[in-house]
Amino acid sequence: MLCAIYKSKKKLGSYLYVANREDFSLVPSVLLEHFGKPELVMMFNLLGRKALYNVDCNEVLETIKRQGFYLQIAKQDDGLFNSLSEIK
């Protein structure tokens, strides 16, 4: 499965993974407001041989299937995205 990976200009180290390029329809609008305008980093094959940095491909794949997107945040997060479950 190919996915599109976007980085946040507002939040250093935050990445948003979606199944289809430029399709943010399943991402909550509040999350997108905090994330800022997504900047495409790359298209990535989650079922391929290459690994992602700091995140498991299977976890990303399952989360995208379940909720339509995957949010990767920096380990030193200041709490901006910690309440993702409340945003939904």
Swiss-Prot record:
Superkingdom of the organism of origin: Bacteria
InterPro entries: YcgL-like_sf (IPR038068), YcgL_dom (IPR027354)
Residue ranges occupied by any YcgL domain in the UniProt entry: 1-85
Name of one Pfam family that matches: YcgL
PANTHER family: PROTEIN YCGL (PTHR38109:SF1)
Protein name (Swiss-Prot/TrEMBL): YcgL domain-containing protein CGSHiEE_04830
Native source species: Haemophilus influenzae (strain PittEE)
Taxon lineage: Bacteria, Pseudomonadati, Pseudomonadota, Gammaproteobacteria, Pasteurellales
